[in-house]
Amino acid sequence: MAAATRYMLDTNMASYIVRGSGPALAARLVAVPMAQLCVSSVTEGELLYGLARRPSATALHTVVQEFLRRLDVLAWDSAAARRYGALRAALEAAGTPLGNLDTLIAAHALSVGAILVTNDRAFARVPALVVENWGAS
């Protein structure tokens, strides 16, 4: 039996979900089993940074914490680090670097064989990374 496809939500998609997604994104979320959804611990860090900048937004804190509780948050590991080193060097050599956090997330998705769900077109520059935009643009 083949392993189920994993979908890693980028920070922008996670933010859209937390803020209340549009109909296309909501439809995709309903169609995909929760066990197939994940975020990188890098995305978790970005979401928590956003909360730290808005300590009085208690409703947002509750929503983000619940979102993170329901999804698999994949820990950054040595496999992701090895992929990051090679990916960053390749992107820089090609003259097409990504931002540091985006490179970390792309490397993490590649290291676990996940499809990256994002609307950031810059990820198309990453060789071998499968990207899907679930309609939140």
Protein language model regions, located:
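A secondary-structure boundary/capping signal
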Residues: L9-T11, S40-T43, N119, P127
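Short, well-structured N-terminal submotif of metal-dependent ribonuclease cores
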Residues: M1-V39, Y49-E66, S137
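Active-site neighborhoods of divalent-metal-dependent phosphate/nucleic-acid chemistry enzymes
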Residues: A2-A3, D72-V117
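Generic structural signal for small/hydrophobic residues in well-ordered secondary structure
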Residues: D10-T11, L25, L47, Y84, ...
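Acidic, metal-binding active-site segment of PIN/NYN-like and related structure-specific nucleases
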Residues: R6, I105-S137
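Alpha-helix capping/helix-boundary segments
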Residues: M13-A14, T43, A80, I105, ...
